[in-house]
Amino acid sequence: MSVALRIALDRDPDVKLGTLATAGTALVVALLAAAAETPARGLHLSLAWPFLLVGLLSPGAAQILITIAIRDSGASRVSMVLGTAPLVSVTIALVFLDEPASAPLIAGAILIVAGGVELARERERPAHLNRLGLAYAFAGATLFAVRDNLVRHLAAGVTTVPPAVAATAALLGGTLLVAVWAREGIGRRWVRFVPAGVLFGASYVSLFEAYYRGRVTVVAPLVAVESLVGVGLSALFLRESEHIGRRLLIGAALIVAGGALIGIYR
């Protein structure tokens, strides 16, 4: 999604339009998935409101931050920062949930920090890179981590809301927040953001399906692989503008390894 969104933003750098069009398209994809799931699992709309509220955090506020970050700092580096979400998730658990610390968790945290250091030590950076965009990306990753824990908490409870319906509710809440923030019509320019929106919608539904079936400690590290995928696709499709170097690749690998270590031993 990040690479497709970067390609669209290169053509039209309007962040408000891009965020609204991407979230709106993702909502349509989720609605189609929910419609396909309904005959077998039902709707249970009256119980979906907690997911609507979760959507205000992510994709709502998070998607605004991520779109700004991708415009200002590029897809590859933002994807790399998003890979730190497992570290944020564990930090939340240690500080607020009193989960015990362990050597593997500390080692995973060190690997993720080392990946961030590699990113900071880059010598050849694109001219358009804005470090503030990386801060936006980390804020988005923090909201992702909060979202992941909330969704898993809701899914592990007694909810009867199907995954696709839950994802639709979250995307609806997020899209409404984005629409209030953007305060503008989509117009005809939204078409260039459709590929990013389709990928976003498909990934969001898949994410909810995963959290309904597995723990955060298993799913979150798998999602962190996005760092490597994002860097790889950026090198393939955005080679001239992204300037993918050795340090960026090493940093992405360290972050994914750290996230995996945290997930396995948490």
Sequence positions of predicted segments:
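Structural signature of hydrophobic alpha-helical transmembrane segments
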Residues: 42-59, 97-113, 156-174, 212-227
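Juxtamembrane helix-start motifs in multi-pass secondary transporters
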Residues: 17-19, 78, 163-167, 219, ...
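Hydrophobic alpha-helical transmembrane segments in multi-pass integral membrane proteins
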Residues: 29-40, 88-105, 141-157, 200-217, ...
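Membrane-interface interhelical linkers
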Residues: 2-53, 63-73, 121-136, 157, ...
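Alpha-helical transmembrane segments of compact multi-pass small-molecule transporters, enriched
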Residues: 25-32, 81-96, 110, 169, ...
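Residue-level signature of transmembrane alpha-helical cores of multipass secondary-active transporters
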Residues: 51-55, 67, 79, 109, ...
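Residues that mark transmembrane-helix kinks and helix-interface sites
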Residues: 2-3, 59-66, 90, 113, ...
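Juxtamembrane helix-loop boundary signature in multi-pass membrane transporters
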Residues: 84-142, 153, 231, 235-236, ...
